Amino acid sequence: MPPTFVLASASPARKRLLEMAGISPLVAVSHFDESSLAADNTVALVEALAKAKAGTVASKFADALVLGCDSLLLVNGQTYGKPESPAVAIARWQTMRGQVGELYTGHALIDRTQNRCLCQTGLTKVHFADVDDDTIQAYVGSGEPLQCAGAFALEGKGGMLINKLDGCSSNVIGLSLPILRSLLQRLGYSLKDFW
């Protein structure tokens, strides 16, 4: 019998991705203060945040697999997380439109039964449509982008504002299923163990 699979995230999109892939996670939100960490580059930061979230939750479980994730968007040398307000989301979209961004998602999988932690980061290039100000205002007014890294949700209305992706689409939603499969296999688990 495999250990309990715990998702250390409040993200409904991550939970939905896992469920669609056949994994029914227990959700335990870390409440980790993301502003307490800094790093030299985006990859190091998303991995550190994912590991901190997973570690905070893993300390509460004796026998579990705990997955922590964190996503950030890099556009023109600027790193973006969730926008703090509608005004910030509008300004970001005015900067991002017509540009290509790099969406990084850090994954940390802690296996409490083996006392091991594996980390890996996914990168997907996002080609943003050159949308007008009215579209930006309407999109931000919908409220959808306010809880998303980079101020867009690929799986929602934001998907209409993306021209193309280079890389893993689930990574953009906040959890790369191919990376999760790889991490599970490296820890000695089969996908069917969780179906």
Curated annotation (Swiss-Prot):
The keyword Hydrolase applies. It catalyses: a ribonucleoside 5'-triphosphate + H2O = a ribonucleoside 5'-phosphate + diphosphate + H(+); a 2'-deoxyribonucleoside 5'-triphosphate + H2O = a 2'-deoxyribonucleoside 5'-phosphate + diphosphate + H(+). This is Nucleoside triphosphate pyrophosphatase. SUPFAM superfamilies: ITPase-like (SSF52972). Belongs to the Maf family. GO terms for biological process: nucleotide metabolic process. Nucleoside triphosphate pyrophosphatase. May have a dual role in cell division arrest and in preventing the incorporation of modified nucleotides into cellular nucleic acids. Disulfide bonds: none annotated. One of its GO terms (cellular component) is cytoplasm. Coiled coil: none annotated. It comes from Synechocystis sp. (strain ATCC 27184 / PCC 6803 / Kazusa). The keyword Cell membrane does not apply. It is found in: Cytoplasm.
